Amino acid sequence: MKINQLPAPVLTHGLVPLAHRLIQLHLFLTRTEVMNEIGITSRLDQGEKGIAVLWHQRLYGAISYAKNATKYQPSAIISRSHDGDLISALVHRFHFRPIRGSSSQGGKEALSAIVNDLKANPLAIHAADGPRGPRGVVKAGLIR
């Protein structure tokens, strides 16, 4: 059985909480070093805005920084797909604010929403390459 064939309650009330706990355990057992973290956080604390940009294949590594970013409650663009439903529920548990959209569904609205969100909040997160690739190539939209 594929994961997307499981009933929604099993996923949202079973798999997502389990994944959250496993990631918390992983974060507890590992050490993360962020280069120039004080420079970044001091600017955010002074009211400056920031967009953390990363590659799709590095998303899990970015979660390790989640515990340091929770006070900023960053917004993150997440696909409107079934997988995006799970990811959205998971990042919400880390105090990220999901904004749903992608290059194929609701991307324009998501980009507009994240720009508006940055007016009220200091930090947003976005994967610069689309989930369909090519990997490591910045897609149009984030930077105009």
List each language-model region with its residue ranges.
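Membrane-anchoring hydrophobic helices of lipid-metabolizing enzymes
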Residues: 1-65
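Short amphipathic alpha-helical segments and helix-helix/interface helices
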Residues: 40-41, 88, 142-143
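Short acidic/histidine-rich motifs immediately flanking catalytic phosphotransfer sites
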Residues: 48, 120-122
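Catalytic core of membrane glycerolipid acyltransferases/transacylases, capturing the structured
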Residues: 49-105
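Acidic, metal-coordinating catalytic cores used for nucleic-acid/nucleotide bond scission
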Residues: 82, 104-107, 131-138
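Structural motif
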Residues: 107-113
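Short, well-structured alpha-helical segments in soluble
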Residues: 114-119
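Membrane-associated lipid acylation/remodeling enzymes share a hydrophobic transmembrane-juxtamembrane segment
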Residues: 122-144
